[in-house]
Amino acid sequence: MDGIIHIGGTMPRIGTTTVGLQLVLFLQSMGYEAAYIEMNRQDYIWGCENLYMDCKQDKLPGKVSIHGVDMYAREWMPELISGGTHYDYLLCDYGNTHRPDFDRKGFTDCGAMVIVAGVKPNEIFATERALRNPVFKEAAYVFSFVSGEDQGEIRNMMRDKARETAFMPYAPDPFDGNPFRKGENTDCFMEIMNYVVRTGGDRDGQVQTDSDG
């Protein structure tokens, strides 16, 4: 399933959707076609449709564009992949990975997995639980709300997953892609995509920067 990235969080409200949307915007800034797929039932797209004035219903069935991000509900995923897609990447947001109805089998059927985690007192045990879960053995980890001075300690805590660990920059607006266009806040997402390439989740085998031409 090349080009398909599945994102899940260790618990609710950990920042999973923000990471997914920011990753879409980062890939767009790199010249790739990317879309966000809501694979959970939190009705985020519905909320955006009723909140943002620039929400556009596309002629393509199921497609909603909000602040330049193409978004689809989970029902459209089979159609997006059955006959091929013009998107280079599909970012699939599975939400909380520890809810009772979480689709473990579906989550692993992809090019790469990303787990969004945290280190606050109410988050660290959920993070450790995810690390012990064999379902997420091949996943990369993105930590939200971690200060720069604490990142080294977190990498040490991650041990053999340190290479697959990244830290989400401050992003109060998940639809704000301006930092990427300025070349800012890119480290986290370059680390994620380097992992995607290593695990075979990239459609053409590489992530090119502007300097690569």
For the regions a language model picked out, list residue spans one by one.
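P-loop/Walker-type NTP enzyme "switch/lid" segment
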Residues: 3-14, 22-25, 29, 33-100, ...
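Hydrophobic positions on the alpha1 helix immediately C-terminal to the Walker A/P-loop
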Residues: 19
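Hydrophobic anchor at the start of a short beta-strand
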Residues: 32-35, 90, 113, 138-140, ...
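C-terminal lobe/tail of nucleotide-utilizing enzymes
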Residues: 137-213
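Inter-motif core of Ras-like GTPase G domains
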Residues: 100-121
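Short, charged/polar "capping" segments at the starts of alpha-helices
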Residues: 43-47, 122-124, 147-155
